[in-house]
Amino acid sequence: MAAAQGLLFWLLLLGPPCRVPGQPEQDPGRRFSQFKLCADEECCMLMYRGEALEDFTGPDCRFVNFKKGDTVYVYYKLAGGSPEVWAGSVGHTFGYFPKDLIQVVHEYTQEELQVPTDETDFVCFDGGRDDFDNYNVEDLLGFLELYDSATEDSEKVKEKTAQRVEEPPEASNESDAEPEPGEPNSEESESVLSENTAELRERSEAQKSHPQVNSQTGHAQGERTSFESFGEMLQDKLKVPDSENNKTSNSSQVSHEQEKIDAYKLLKTEMTLDLKTKFGSTADALVSDDETTRLVTSLEDDFVEDLDPEYYTVGKEEEENKEDFDELPLLTFTDGEDTKSPGHSGIEKHPTEKEQNSNKEHKVEETQPPGIKKGDKEIPKHREDTVFSDVMEGEENTDTDLESSDSKEEDDPLVMDSRLGKPRPEDHTDPEKAADHLVNVEVPKADSDDDPEVGAGLHMKDKGRKVEEPRRDWVQHEVGLEDETQEDQAVQGSSQSGHLRSSPAAEKSTETLKSAFANQENDLKGAAVHISKEMLHEEKPSGRSLEGASKSDSVPQAKAAGNQGEEGKTEREPVGVAAPSGDHQPNASKDSVDEVDGSISGPKPHVLSGEHPSAELIKDRLLKLQNQTRFSSPDDMGLPGDLEKKRPILERKLSWQQGGVAAAVNKQVSEKRELPEEEVTRVTKDASDEGQEVRKTGQTDSIEGRGFRPKEPNPEDEDYSPEELLEDENAVSAKQSKERSPEIQDKRLDVDLQNPEKPVSGAIKTDPETEKNKEETRHVSENERKNETAGKAVDSLGRDAGGPVVEKEGSSPVHQKVQRPSEGSDVPGKKQNQTPELGEASQKKDPDYLKEDNHEGHPKTSGLMEKPGVEPSKEDDEHAEKFVDPGSRGSASEDPDDDPFPWAPHAPVQPEESVHLEDLPIISSFFKDQQSLQRFQKYFDIHKLEAMFQDMSSKLKSAQRESLPYNVEKVLDKVFRAWESHILTEAENMLDARVTENRDLETKDSSVFEEAAVLDDVQDLIYFVRYKHSTVEETAPPAAAQPVEGGWDGPAEDTQPPLEENFPQEHMEVPLMQIPKEPGHLAQPVTRDMGTSGVAQKPQTEEDGDPGIITPQGTPVDADDAQKQLAANTEEPASVTPLENAIAFIYSLVFHLTKTLLATLPDDVQPGPDFYGLPWKPVLITASLGIVSFAVFFWRTVLAVKSRVYQVTEQQISEKLKNIMKENAELVQKLSSYEQKIKESKKHVQETKKQNMILSDEAIKFKDKIKSLEETNEILGDTAKSLRAMLESEREQNAKNQDLISENKKSIEKLKDVISVNASEFSEVQIALNEAKLSEEKVKSECHRVQEENARLKKKKEQLQQEIKDWSKSHAELSEQIRSFEKSQKDLEVALTHKDDNINALTNCITQLNRLDCESESEDQNKGGSESDELANGEVGGDRSEKVKNQIKQMMDVSRTQTAISVVEEDLKLLQCKLRASMSTKCNLEDQIKKLEEDRSSLQSAKTVLEDECKTLRQKVEILNELYQQKEMALQKKLSQEEYERQEREQRLSAADEKAVLAAEEVKTYKRRIEEMEDELQKTERSFKNQIATHEKKAHDNWLKARAAERAIAEEKREAANLRHKLLELTQKMAMMQEEPVIVKPMPGRPNTQNPPRRGPLSQNGSFGPSPVSGGECSPPLTADPPARPLSATLNRREMPRSEFGSVDGPLPRPRWASEASGKPSASDPESGAAPTVNSSSRSSSPSKVMDEGKVSMAAKGPPPFPGTPLMSSPVGGPLLPPIRYGPPPQLCGPFGPRPLPPPFGPGMRPPLGLREYAPGVPPGKRDLPLDPREFLPPGHAPFRPLGSLGPREYFFPGTRLPPPNHGPQDYPPSSAARDLPPSGSRDEPPPASQGASQDCSPALKQSP
């Protein structure tokens, strides 16, 4: 940070002064610089890897564009120039950029080579364009203009900003919001940037003390603006958004200047900016395509938290700068957004560079989520055009809302803030934002007057989620803007937001903010970074942000190194102050609760930051969780439906998608809000008020228990409970912003907890008031519905309920928020309601849980299932916790809906929710990850792609329906390929447009990898659509209809989404009521709100999920869950049987209904989480099983008993017996005749089969012959063609050769002349050459001799030199020895002399001393005797002493002299050492001289050698020249030879021509022969076909006769059996009557009451085999009316008597299927006109022939006599039978009557097939199931076949696509050996057919179309 700041600071400091002198220097020709510094000479090696500190957009294509956090690779640097420019690459783009805009992360090399530049270095690297007029870097980067106009513009900007701030909301919203910010900003930004550059220098110190972030921000932005902004300023002037962005940067720069004025202001402003970043929506965000504008947060976003004392104090200072700061808040976006908010972004840029880098992803999400960036900026990215227009529409609507809100403002003092017009910019930004604006509008006028931020705070309260992020943004803005207004607003805002919290909480937060703010100044950077990060995180997982918010409040702040904590505190505290109003009071309706919760959420954050609020928050959350666990799911699911809708919206807004999504939402809202947004707002307010009342009643308990709720929610407050759900939205956005700031997450957690409690309490109806509130909410919702048409009435209700609450709780903002969500969710909100609820439900529940609980999820959401749903809510919480951190889990569990919803759906759903995930069922169901969805949305127009995907889906559906079953896949593949290319083309175009757009916007949003990933996503989506259709509709044909209806949203969802769309507001209002007890009730007004969204979606998810169909509802549900569910659904067909699907569906439906019913029960009657300690599930299952078993038992025992009253008299019986006897006799005769006929017909059939086999074999042989002849013919034709081509080429070659020959002849003649000339020259040359050779030999001999002599001399020289060296060495050694000996000798002599002298002196001294001693003794003796001086010897004593003294002196002198001598000797030694050194150096020099002389001599010798070599080389050159001439002559000879060879080749070619002509003639003859052969073959083929046809006709006739005989026999058998039975009965009765003569009164109709004759064998599945001509279905010979089947068709096999052959006559008869029962032809029913062509072909000829040939077709014989009619009788052109099918056809009837459609069978879950359903010899599973419904049986009905021979029909199955066995063209029972085999015991396996039959099957199958 410091380095980056320093770079920016010095760049700004030094840039301007250097500009003037530098400009002329920077234009050395067409170059930026004369030299460049590289790591190597080619400048191709990397020097540095850096990270972008800011966004940069170059003035032209020579510069590379990048965004903050992008990785930049530096290859070289330009030398000189005031703005140092480097060249590098970002992704695949290469260009120049200012050095100071990147931070070096890694240095690859330290070496720098200065290389001159080339003009080609300064052209466009993309296209090479070099037509540039300006090569002055300073001019291009706009330094001069920025610098010159900085002061004036900055002042203007300040003034304009002040004016804008001061302007009323309308003016500011309308005029300033968009155009004004843009114009002044573009100009002002330049001036401000320049001023800031100068001021930044001054402020650099203050910035250091303050968050250097400001200085950095100023510098970064100033620099950035200086670089980028200046280039952009022109664009900004054109682009209001850009100008707004510039204005933002300008205002931020102004804020930097104000930083000089007050660092606190800047810090607060930056904090506000940070808060803004976190704030999902920007009330005042100006709508524009500019990225910066997107990032701008509206002033309204400033929270009442600004009211905090700290803000209040700072507010005064900021009041001075408030204009600028207001400008900043309005236009600035938070760091998360791109850190374009100059001041704040600067802080965040550097401190939050990490954030932005890490949050860059978030930045896209976060920065845009703030709503402004997203609203404005992201809109350009994703839907800049449409969304912008939509946003403008939303603005208009918002304006309408604002006007209505303004009127409301008159009613509500809070409205003034919204009037400040700041809400309108936000309104422009987002309808939801507009709703927020409306909410802000509802903010008290005093607040709005004092500070639009207060309104923003309230507005943020309404936004809830938005508030959480913007709260920080607002806090920042508030810090800046509200420093003035914060005093008033802090009072009002704190009073308003603190109504619930109580002023003390606000004060605490204010104090905390002060302290934190003071800390934040220093910590702001980190805090801002952390906050923005937290905001990102918070926005992403709002659930996390809840818990994480609490954690982040305490922990993230701590993480912020205390800076963030402080900043978080300040933000929280402002947020806390505003947070109650803004963060958790985003549900302004919650304001009381939120303020209570705000104290929880806002104050808690304050407490967390200042106190240990995290613990309190956790406790509160736990309480909330407990309450919510009971009710959170309902609450979340009910109110959260809206809240979640809003949450997703908010989260989306929070996410970068928020802008675009919000814009889309605005669009949808504006479109859908036909009513003025006032009415919608009022309706939503009313709904939210009532919903809040409901919640608040519940929340009052939980909140009051927490002690956070100072005020108990009024009924109006309860009305706002839906807005509390908005808090859930806030939780969602908190989750998003949780990533941005855990602090906000804490607040959101509190909010979410509050929301869950409120919705929970409302849903639980814990209090009678809550229930009443629910009813009120329902009434409100109904009223709102009415108000949708007459919103004013509801508006009055909303104001009544919400107005007071708004004043107290800031619920009016909540209302607006509710309105915003409701408005946004009128259409989007509703969809979002479903989506959020589904998301919650799905997130709460696992995919399985979704199935069950999604049905229940909405009831839970509505709170109907609350109590039983306590566990579900817990599960939801757990599920949410899974998505959220352990910390976030608390919040997630508290707000499981919020958590889970924001979590998974948050990713896909949130982006989509503003877009309406329901509007994007396909895309939303595909994306699990919000980031991927956001990324997807960033590059593409999602709505357009969704439309294309839906078109593709519809095309696939129609193709699937229209195409024949066997051809479905091919048709689908064609459609798929066509749409794939179309969609990919469109997607690439969108991507290119988006990339260019991003470049224009200076936003390098995408890397190449990201673009590639997005395109991969598009392709995956295409495959997803294709796969969905193939799996859904094929695997589950019965359910496929539902999926088609349901579409992507599921069958229920299609119908329900409209309801949800119609009632999103009501949905918000009456979450509890919204949950319909039954999906059918979704249409009810109450259910419309929650029920439609919640219940409808749950049933939808259930229905969709159960059938295994992918339900787009999964998208509304957690994205993860949705995708899991989707995957599970797609996989279900394979793994789940239809029965299981049906059971699951019924189970989920029952579970849902029970939940809805239980939810409606009074609270005291609702069941608990368990049943006396046992889980409900097993208890219910056992109870249901008991009931079912009892019912079955009762039915089997009691109801089965039938009264058997015999109504037949003896006479009747006797008559019947007689008749029966007669009939029996007749039948016996008939049977015998039929048996004979059958035998005869079997013989005929066998004969015909044999004949057919013979004929088919012959036909095959002929075919083989024909094929071989055709092949030979083709080969000959090819050879003939090749020969012709060769002939033509040879002819052409011959012509060319002739020309060459003529030319060659001419050249030969010329060459001959030349040769003659050359020959003479050559002779001369040879002579000269010979002479040269002789001279060369002489020279060589001389050279050898000289060389030998030279070698001998060298050897001698070397020997002599070696001898010299040896002698010199020995001489030196000896001389050294002599010297050493002499020295030692001298030393010894000197030492001896010294010693002698010393000895002499010492002896003298000793003798003298002895004398002295003697004399002293004598003197002592003589003292007494004589005093005379004379001694004995006559000497005087005095003289003696003198002598002694003299001697002593002498001795002293001797010692002195000796010391002097020693000194001299030492000097002498030193001199000797020097002498030795000089001697050694001399020797060394002499040695060197010798070496040099030797080197010189060697070089001279080498020189002579080289000269000799040079001479020899010159001679060689001469010789080579001569050789070259000789070779030329040889080549000329070769040329002549080649000419002769050419002539020979030409002759050969002429001969080849003749041969080719002959070959052509032969080819013609062959062709004639081939044609003749073909004619003969055709004739023979026709004759054979005719024979085959006649045989087949005969065979079919025989088969018909046999079947008729069989049928007659079977009927007779039945009748005989019946008669036997009757006989037995009669005999018994007769015996009884004889024994007991009892008169039985005859009862009329007795015969009819008896069992009808059993005619089972005549059923379709009877014993009749397939027609010999048809390889397929066996059916009775119903001529043209298939339904006219025998009565026995409905009998089971058990009811059929055995045939005389010893086997049951046929398999279990199938019920008439849909085709027969409904009268509609089934796809495979031949009788219905769908006779399969494959069937036809197989029946028209022998299987082998038909299948192999596929060409033989027989003429139709009119309507087929039976369903399995032979091909010959069916029209040849009839529709083909469907191909392989893995699922049964839709069954409409069962054996006992109509039955429900069975669930789809998985690919491996086909129902068991009857014997007839398999081709002979083909085991089950090897062939496709027939489509004919008659060929499918429900599982479990497999008949048992007794052992024995098969009936004639039982050997053949409806294998219409399979060939008959090898027996012959007529498919008849296989050989007797095969017939002897017992039939399979089940229908799953056909009886084994003969081997021939099985062998024929495989080729037939292969060849069947």
From Swiss-Prot:
UniProt KW keywords: Coiled coil, Endoplasmic reticulum, ER-Golgi transport, Exocytosis, Glycoprotein, Membrane, Methylation, Phosphoprotein, Protein transport, SH3 domain, Signal, Transmembrane, Transmembrane helix, Transport
Q: Which residues form a coiled coil?
A: 467-527, 1211-1393, 1484-1636
Q: In this chain, where does the modification Asymmetric dimethylarginine occur?
A: 1781
Instruction: Enumerate composition-biased segments (Basic and acidic residues).
Output: 154-167, 198-208, 234-245, 337-366, 373-386, 419-436, 459-480, 531-542, 669-714, 736-751, 766-789, 842-859, 868-884, 1821-1831
Gene3D superfamilies assigned to the protein according to its UniProt record, in alphabetical order: SH3 Domains (2.30.30.40)
Q: Where is the composition biased (Acidic residues)?
A: 173-190, 317-327, 392-414, 715-730
Q: Which PROSITE patterns match?
A: SH3
**Matches recorded under CDD domains:** SH3_MIA3
- Residues in the Lumenal compartment per record: 23-1141, 1163-1173
**Protein localization:** Endoplasmic reticulum membrane
Q: Where is the composition biased (Pro residues)?
A: 1776-1806
Glycan-carrying positions: 173, 246, 627
Segments carrying the region annotation (Mediates interaction with MIA2) are 1208-1647
Topology in the lipid bilayer is annotated as: Single-pass membrane protein
Please classify the protein's predominant subcellular localization into one broad category.
endoplasmic reticulum
Region described as Disordered: 154-259, 313-621, 657-908, 1036-1059, 1085-1118, 1416-1443, 1639-1905
Q: Where is this region: Proline-rich domain (PRD)?
A: 1748-1905
| Intramembrane residue ranges | 1142-1162
Describe its partners and assembly state: Interacts with MIA2. Interacts (via SH3 domain) with COL7A1. Interacts with the COPII coat subunits SEC23A, SEC23B and maybe SEC24C. May interact with APOB and MIA2. Interacts with SEC16A.
Per the entry, what this protein does is:
Plays a role in the transport of cargos that are too large to fit into COPII-coated vesicles and require specific mechanisms to be incorporated into membrane-bound carriers and exported from the endoplasmic reticulum. This protein is required for collagen VII (COL7A1) secretion by loading COL7A1 into transport carriers. It may participate in cargo loading of COL7A1 at endoplasmic reticulum exit sites by binding to COPII coat subunits Sec23/24 and guiding SH3-bound COL7A1 into a growing carrier.
Protein name (Swiss-Prot/TrEMBL): Transport and Golgi organization protein 1 homolog
The source organism is Bos taurus (Bovine)
Question: What is the gene called?
Answer: MIA3
